[in-house]
Swiss-Prot record:
Protein name: Isocitrate dehydrogenase [NADP] cytoplasmic
Organism taxonomic ancestry: Eukaryota, Metazoa, Chordata, Craniata, Vertebrata
Gene expressing this chain: IDH1
Molecular-function GO term, any one: isocitrate dehydrogenase (NADP+) activity
One of the GO biological process terms: tricarboxylic acid cycle
Cofactors demanded by this protein: Mg(2+); Mn(2+)
Signal peptide: none
Length: 13
């Protein structure tokens, strides 16, 4: 879901 994508982007950072 969106939360998962947000976490993924934050994880990249």
């Amino acid at each position: 879901d969106l939360a998962g994508e947000i976490h993924g982007l934050s994880n990249v950072k």
